[in-house]
């Protein structure tokens, strides 16, 4: 069981590394978007933005898979812990029976304190497992993400691309910076929650 737990944790770490690499690749593509926008080449910027979004989604998918593997590892860890707690509770119960038979109140109190501590530890393990199983949020469509990323990079660098984006088909643009920041905030919160 311990070997399985080790393999699960190792796999989760590998998936997290893949997620970080995809995020790094996404940032590199975003830099290419900026360069293309500086050269007034919106078409190339769109291609690079699509690559950036694809890499970002790939990273989120790797992270999501790592989270699932980590959740399984938590379940295995809980099973191992529960086995140990059950064994300890059996010992405590025997000690409690022995203490009650002699009616030594100090021993009864000591055994009950140990029992309550083990129940609290069990609650903590259960809470950690439930927290690791929280659901993931749904991402918006890639086209909106592409336009949003182009707008964000253009705004951050003071570039004028609104007139060029307005020439695109209806509904292809106009996702604001607040939408991107909201998504990034959500991803940051999820990533922080996964690390804890």
UniProtKB/Swiss-Prot annotation:
Topology within the bilayer: Peripheral membrane protein
Positions of the UniProt region annotated as Disordered:
173-196
Q: Which InterPro entries match?
A: Snf7_fam
Segments forming a coiled coil: 5-47, 102-124
Q: Which Pfam families match?
A: Snf7
> Impact of changing residue 194 to A on the protein?
No effect on interaction with IST1
Q: In which tissues is it expressed?
A: Expressed in placenta, cultured skin fibroblasts and in osteoblast cell line MG-63.
Keyword check for RNA-binding: no
Q: Which GO terms describe its molecular function?
A: identical protein binding; metallopeptidase activity; protein domain specific binding; protein homodimerization activity; zinc ion binding
Q: Which residues carry this modification: N-acetylmethionine?
A: 1
In this UniProt entry, the residues modified to Phosphoserine are 101, 173
Set out the biological process GO terms recorded for this chain's protein: autophagosome maturation; autophagy; cell division; endosome transport via multivesicular body sorting pathway; ESCRT III complex disassembly; late endosome to lysosome transport; late endosome to vacuole transport; membrane fission
Report the domain of life of the source organism. Eukaryota
Keywords for the protein's UniProt record, in alphabetical order: Acetylation, Cell cycle, Cell division, Coiled coil, Cytoplasm, Endosome, Membrane, Neurodegeneration, Nucleus, Phosphoprotein, Protein transport, Repressor, Transcription, Transcription regulation, Transport
- GO cellular component term, pick one: nuclear matrix
Query: Where in or outside the cell is it found?
Result: Cytoplasm; Endosome membrane; Nucleus matrix
> What triggers its expression?
By muristerone.
Q: Where is this motif: MIT-interacting motif?
A: 185-195
Q: Which disease is it linked to?
A: Pontocerebellar hypoplasia 8: An autosomal recessive neurodevelopmental disorder characterized by severe psychomotor retardation, abnormal movements, hypotonia, spasticity, and variable visual defects. Brain MRI shows pontocerebellar hypoplasia, decreased cerebral white matter, and a thin corpus callosum.
Q: What does this protein do?
A: Probable peripherally associated component of the endosomal sorting required for transport complex III (ESCRT-III) which is involved in multivesicular bodies (MVBs) formation and sorting of endosomal cargo proteins into MVBs. MVBs contain intraluminal vesicles (ILVs) that are generated by invagination and scission from the limiting membrane of the endosome and mostly are delivered to lysosomes enabling degradation of membrane proteins, such as stimulated growth factor receptors, lysosomal enzymes and lipids.
User: Which family is annotated?
Assistant: Belongs to the SNF7 family.
Q: How does it assemble?
A: Probable peripherally associated component of the endosomal sorting required for transport complex III (ESCRT-III). ESCRT-III components are thought to multimerize to form a flat lattice on the perimeter membrane of the endosome. Several assembly forms of ESCRT-III may exist that interact and act sequentially. Self-associates. Interacts with CHMP1B. Interacts with VPS4A. Interacts with VPS4B. Interacts with PHF1. Interacts with IST1. Interacts with MITD1.
**Name of this chain's protein:** Charged multivesicular body protein 1a
**Source organism (scientific name):** Homo sapiens
């Amino acid at each position: 069981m311990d070997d399985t737990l080790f393999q699960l944790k190792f796999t989760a770490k590998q998936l997290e590394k893949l997620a970080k690499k995809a995020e790094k690749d996404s940032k590199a593509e975003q830099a290419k978007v900026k360069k293309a926008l500086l050269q007034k080449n919106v078409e190339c910027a769109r291609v690079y933005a699509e690559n950036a979004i694809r890499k970002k989604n790939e990273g989120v998918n790797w992270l999501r898979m790592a989270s699932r593997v980590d959740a399984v590892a938590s379940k295995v860890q809980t099973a191992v812990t529960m086995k140990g707690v059950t064994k300890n509770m059996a010992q405590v119960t025997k000690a409690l029976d022995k203490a009650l038979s002699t009616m030594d109140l100090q021993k009864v109190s000591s055994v009950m304190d140990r029992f309550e501590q083990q129940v609290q530890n069990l609650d903590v393990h259960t809470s950690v497992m439930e927290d690791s199983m929280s659901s993931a949020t749904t991402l918006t469509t890639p086209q909106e993400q592409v336009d949003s990323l182009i707008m964000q990079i253009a705004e951050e660098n003071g570039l004028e691309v609104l007139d060029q984006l307005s020439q695109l088909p209806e509904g292809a643009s106009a996702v604001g910076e607040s939408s991107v920041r909201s998504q990034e905030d959500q991803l940051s919160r999820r990533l922080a929650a996964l690390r804890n």
